[in-house]
From Swiss-Prot:
NAD(+) binds at residues 71-76, 105-109, 129-130, 142, 151. The gene is aroB. Keywords: Amino-acid biosynthesis, Aromatic amino acid biosynthesis, Cobalt, Cytoplasm, Lyase, Metal-binding, NAD, Nucleotide-binding, Zinc. Its cofactor is Co(2+); Zn(2+); NAD(+). CDD domains: DHQS. GO terms for cellular component: cytoplasm. Zn(2+) binds at residues 184, 246, 263. Catalyzes the conversion of 3-deoxy-D-arabino-heptulosonate 7-phosphate (DAHP) to dehydroquinate (DHQ). Pathway: Metabolic intermediate biosynthesis; chorismate biosynthesis; chorismate from D-erythrose 4-phosphate and phosphoenolpyruvate: step 2/7. This is 3-dehydroquinate synthase. GO terms for molecular function: 3-dehydroquinate synthase activity; metal ion binding; nucleotide binding.
Length: 355
């Protein structure tokens, strides 16, 4: 299946197909002329797929080098970025060459940032290997790295030339790594796609059920992301809906120490906490918090953060990218499949941190 991201200045396709990673070279050859390519990945993904993708690209006429770094959210920083820059220089990459981001969200965010800033921008594509990356972070052109202050605090908007999604690679993920991606899938059902929510309701929550329906879950999620990105590429309006659960979720990730709590886990806890307080305030429908909680628990996602410290979380919230002046654009769900923006002051935001 192909999904067109029809952004006027940079349209591209998402290709979703079981086994398509084996044809990575042919796919890229349709996008780029033969040239130098650097595959950016982490050490874990490299051990599974780097050689396979490298050979496929070489067979298609590309000159390929591989840069891998130690896996983990804690490596998504400017120190790693500098190492990639140095590698690109040593390989002699010019503005006519490109980067292949092969990995999960950490790899995709970092490689995209490098591509968008090296020589003021070179071409890149995404080959996501985690569920979170396949349904969310590889699509839409947000790149970035973390700082000690906040997640993704330094970043750019830069669209890839294409996204290649192979659902079969999810079978090599650990249980926790697969399940955390369901945090984003559940979010899509809540903010835009009641049909997806209905499917999630039917599934029993097992790893087997996720893998069996992975292609459908990915397609639904990508269609929601496509709609939001095409209508609002730069995150000023409808695309903000994608941040449901992320305001508190990002704060949890930052205060826990990057890599301690996985992104989808933090999103799940963020959705539950925001919904609980918003429902108490009459801003979200009665009973929706219970529905979200039960859905997250069914798939094995955490719903409560054990190291809850209001002051630390609040400090992290003050660096949220949805903040404008003293106002934060909070995303709420007005009804199943429909989201709204609810502006609150930073002071009011403290209410949403009360357990």
């Amino acid at each position: 299946m192909k999904i067109r991201i029809d952004i006027p200045h940079h349209p591209y396709d998402i290709q979703i197909e079981k086994g398509c990673m084996a044809q990575a070279g042919q796919w890229l050859r349709e996008l780029w002329q033969p040239q130098k390519v650097v595959i950016v990945t982490d050490n874990h993904v490299a051990s599974l797929y780097a050689e396979k993708v490298k050979l496929s690209l070489e067979d298609a006429g590309f000159q390929v080098a591989v840069f891998d770094f130690l896996e983990g959210e804690e490596r998504k920083n400017l120190t790693t970025v500098q190492k990639v820059y140095e590698f690109l220089v040593k390989q002699g990459l010019t503005r006519s060459d490109g980067i292949v981001a092969l990995g999960g969200g950490v790899v995709g965010d970092l490689a995209g940032f490098v591509a968008s800033t090296y020589m003021r921008g070179i071409h890149f594509v995404q080959i996501p290997t985690s569920l979170t990356a396949q349904v969310d972070s590889s699509i839409g052109g947000k790149t970035g790295v973390n700082t000690p202050f906040a997640k993704n605090m330094v970043g750019t908007f830069a669209q890839p030339d294409g996204v290649l999604i192979d659902p079969l690679v999810l079978e090599t993920l650990g249980k926790r790594e697969l399940i955390e991606g369901m945090g984003e899938v559940i979010k899509y059902g809540l903010i835009e796609d009641p049909e997806l929510w209905a499917l999630l309701t039917e599934l029993n929550g097992s790893v087997e059920s996720i893998l069996e329906h992975a292609e459908t879950l990915i397609e639904h999620s990508c269609q929601v992301k496509r709609k939001m990105v095409v209508e609002d590429e730069l995150d000023n309006g409808i695309r903000l809906y994608l941040n449901f659960g992320h305001t508190i979720g990002h704060a949890i990730e930052a205060t826990a120490g990057y890599g301690k709590v996985m992104h989808g886990e933090a999103v799940a806890m963020g959705m539950v906490q925001i919904s609980k307080v918003a429902e108490e305030k009459g801003l979200m429908p009665a009973g929706i918090t219970q529905s979200i909680t039960e859905m997250c628990q069914k798939f094995g996602l955490p719903v409560d953060y054990e190291n809850w410290e209001v002051d630390k979380l609040y400090q992290a919230l003050t660096h949220d990218k949805k903040t404008r002046g003293n106002t934060l654009k909070l995303v709420l769900v007005s009804e199943l499949g429909s989201a709204i923006i609810h502006p609150v002051s930073l002071e009011e935001m403290k209410d949403y941190l009360v357990k």
